[in-house]
Amino acid sequence: MPGLNCRFYQHKFPEVDDVVMVNVRSIAEMGAYVSLLEYNNIEGMILLSELSRRRIRSINKLIRIGRNECVVVIRVDKDKGYIDLSKRRVSPEEALKCEDKFTKSKTVYSILRHVAEVLDYTKDEQLDSLFQRTAWVFDEKYKKPGYGAYDAFKNAVSDPDILDGLDLSEDERRVLIDNINRRLTPQAVKIRADIEVACYGYEGIDAVKDALRAGLSCSTENMPIKINLIAPPRYVMTTTTLERTEGLSVLNQAMSVIKERIEEKRGVFNVQMEPKVVTDTDETELARQLERLEKENAEVDGDDDADEMEAKTED
């Protein structure tokens, strides 16, 4: 079956001042020819004068064939199909918003395209109809093309009744819900940071323990923090959460508390690795490190009684 195609949004053309995602197809004397990815790959052009605010010394440093770019629409002739675009007029903030909108809209597109394939649709018109009866309904309802459908689909993971008002057959509804759940069900991520905490004063060991406990107190019920000793003075902090941004924030907050507490005792605090989402490979390597250190420490008398500190619910 040939691949089905459809634009992301109900309107067939972008409006002037819209920031859109394009893919560069070719570069000519006049400028760069691009495909508007959100509008079923209709053609547009970035004039050379709209590539950069600075003098152009090398076009290839500004734009390359095959690369995606965020550009702003400066002219649309719907009758002739001409779309003029500018790269130099897009601010960094606008580019970030464009990337976010494109990512979410592409997710909705992927879900509906897969629904169409599962249901053996063979014509682009059938996919277009599916968009009209689902994604574009929510885009229009919330007046947010791209975001409306994504937010509605995401909420449908926990509340499928959101889809009740849509004009769908039983098969369409069933397959749509299955695909929404498969693509948008939140996945837990593990976030890790590596720190060094030390205090060489008379009560140095107690000062370190006190600082780490203060960091652990930043744990929440949904985001428990763990702190493991790698090798003095280095520790690894981890938390597992469904909310990536909040998880990063909680670890940063805990690190700030540890830093403040240990420095009150004239101790030392250094960040060896900023909080980041870690992969299974990272975790496997960390587990090997901890296992190796555990074996080494088992041979040493007088080990500290805790290589791992976990958040506790004690008052």
From Swiss-Prot:
The gene is eif2s1. Residues 299-308 have a biased composition (Acidic residues). It comes from Xenopus laevis (African clawed frog). GO terms for biological process: cellular response to amino acid starvation; cellular response to UV; negative regulation of translational initiation in response to stress; PERK-mediated unfolded protein response; response to endoplasmic reticulum stress; translational initiation. Belongs to the eIF-2-alpha family. The modification Phosphoserine is found at residues 49, 52. This is Eukaryotic translation initiation factor 2 subunit 1. Residues 292-315 are annotated as: Disordered. Its main location: cytoplasm.
